């Protein structure tokens, strides 16, 4: 029988995450990262022992910690000793559109296929997407006591980076 490991990142709406976990069946295990910026207690109360929580990281968009928490989730799956046939990455805001049987059947029909989405940014013409890879995004991973100051500094640095000829190679 195939077994799925769901790796989930969340930062809000513990009741929704509990509904997501309840909607997916007992042929799956759940590994969850809760952003360190969020209060974990509602998630612990809502999920109990239905999930495995991994060490927490403070997450900001575009920050290196996004890679770190994904590594934590994958390490938990690999060290579980359970032979999963699939690892599925979800956010805490997702919800299944298919039945559990349809999900398992689809993966069984596509055993040799990995589903990883992406697009080529080499020829990207959308300015908002292009600047995400050509410009630096400083200050994302630094801990701040005041989110107001952090946001002001990020906006100022974004404007400065757009003016200066500093680009990633």
Residues covered by each model-derived region:
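ER/Golgi luminal nucleotide-sugar-dependent glycosyltransferases, focusing on the catalytic module
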Residues: 1-169
